[in-house]
Amino acid sequence: MPTPSMEDYIEQIYILIEEKGYARVSDIAEALSVHPSSVTKMVQKLDKDEYLVYEKYRGLVLTPKGRKIGQRLVYRHELLEQFLRLIGVSEENIYRDVEGIEHHLSWNAIDRIGDLVQYFQEDERRLEALRDVQKRNEQGE
């Protein structure tokens, strides 16, 4: 299993490849706000661990293993954003909150959060009931 730091890189590489068709060290560095030399070190480690294939000055390609994990990491991130919006977390806090929790939840917990999001999406009245509870709690403060 990749470390949380490795996950951040794999996720970002996956996103860049999906958006642009490629991911360069400079693009990854800019997206993650890190120095290119840090990206090079991590990319070499990810290559060694067979998440991607890296050729200096030629770029990188995710392996099937790296693509699968990248896809799952993007799903996790998007699901957590969706969940936090659903429960009423303010938009300006969502990205930071997701970044703070995403590496600490098991995949079982992620799957259960997915179930909960689906539960609320299947019947608008459930979401309205949640909003009513939140409104009552805010008035009680």
From Swiss-Prot:
PANTHER family listed in its UniProt record: IRON (METAL) DEPENDENT REPRESSOR, DTXR FAMILY, TRANSCRIPTIONAL REGULATOR MNTR
Cellular component GO terms, alphabetical: cytoplasm
Protein name (database record): HTH-type transcriptional regulator MntR
UniProt keyword list: Activator, Cytoplasm, DNA-binding, Manganese, Metal-binding, Repressor, Transcription, Transcription regulation
Species name: Geobacillus kaustophilus (strain HTA426)
SMART domains: HTH_DTXR (SM00529)
Domain of life assignment: Bacteria
Localisation per UniProt entry: Cytoplasm
Lineage per the UniProt record: Bacteria, Bacillati, Bacillota, Bacilli, Bacillales
Residues involved in Mn(2+) 2 binding: 11, 77, 99, 102
Residues of the signal peptide: none
